[in-house]
A protein has these predicted regions:
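Short hydrophobic/aromatic-rich motifs at helix boundaries and adjacent loops
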Residues: 3-4, 65
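Short hydrophobic/aromatic segments of transmembrane alpha-helices and their interfaces
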Residues: 7-8, 108
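Extreme N-terminal starter segment of soluble prokaryotic enzymes
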Residues: 11-15
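Flexible, gly/pro- and Lys/Arg-enriched active-site loops
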Residues: 56, 68-71, 88-91, 96-182
Length: 182
C-alpha cells in the first residue's frame, strides 16, 4: 500500500504540549534548551496534572488520576521559528528528540518527555487544507482563514485540561484566543 503524497506545509510558529513524569525538571529543561535553538520560545508555567481542576467537567475523564498513574508535569510552549520549516520535518525532529531522552530506559506509564504539536502557524495560506491529513490520517483543524493561517492537530482537540491551563497562561502575552475559543 502506497502512502499518499503529503502537502508541503511551511510553518513559522507552533504551539507545543510538553509533559514528563520522570525527572521532570531535568527533561523539561532539556526541552526548553533544545527548542530555543529554533527560534524565540515562550513557555507557560509548569503545572502538575494532579493540581489542575476544572469547573465545567468537560474533560474530567481525560484528567482522572489513579494511585498507579504517575503525576505528569505539563507545560505549553509557543515557538516562533527563526527560519520557517516544513511541518513534516518539524514533526520528525520533535519525535527524534523525544526518543533521545532516555525513553527506552522506562516503560509506560513512565515517560521522560512528550513533545506534542497542538497547532502550527502556516507561512502561506494553503488552499486545499481541508483535504490534507496529518501523520495519523486525521484532517487538520483550520482555526481561521488568513494570510497566516493557524492549523490545529485534530486529535489534540478538545484540549486536555493541562493544555488549556498552559494556553491560558501563554495568552497573557500572546494572542492564542483562536485556540482557547475552539
Amino acid at each position: 500500500m502506497s502512502v499518499p503524497p503529503r502537502d508541503v506545509i511551511v510553518i513559522e510558529a507552533c504551539v507545543l504540549s510538553l509533559a514528563s513524569n520522570v525527572k521532570q525538571p531535568y527533561y523539561l529543561q532539556k526541552a526548553k534548551d533544545w527548542l530555543q535553538n529554533f527560534g524565540t520560545l515562550t513557555l507557560s508555567a509548569i503545572h502538575p496534572s494532579e493540581d489542575i481542576r476544572i469547573d465545567n467537567n468537560l474533560h474530567d475523564d481525560l484528567n482522572k488520576q489513579t494511585s498507579n498513574t504517575p503525576v505528569y508535569f505539563n507545560q505549553v510552549a509557543y515557538l516562533d521559528f527563526a527560519q520557517p520549516i516544513d511541518y513534516w520535518q518539524w514533526l520528525q525532529l520533535t519525535k527524534k528528540f523525544e526518543q533521545q531522552q532516555d525513553r527506552l530506559l522506562y516503560q509506560k506509564p513512565a515517560v521522560t518527555l512528550d513533545v506534542d504539536i497542538i497547532a502550527v502557524k502556516c507561512l502561506h495560506q494553503i488552499d486545499n487544507i481541508d483535504q490534507s491529513l496529518d501523520e495519523k490520517g486525521n484532517r487538520f483543524v483550520l482555526f481561521a482563514k488568513s494570510e497566516n493561517q493557524w492549523l490545529g492537530i485534530r486529535r489534540r482537540f478538545p484540549l486536555a485540561c493541562y493544555d488549556q491551563v498552559g494556553i491560558v497562561d501563554l495568552s497573557k502575552n500572546i494572542d492564542l484566543s483562536f485556540i482557547r475559543n475552539f
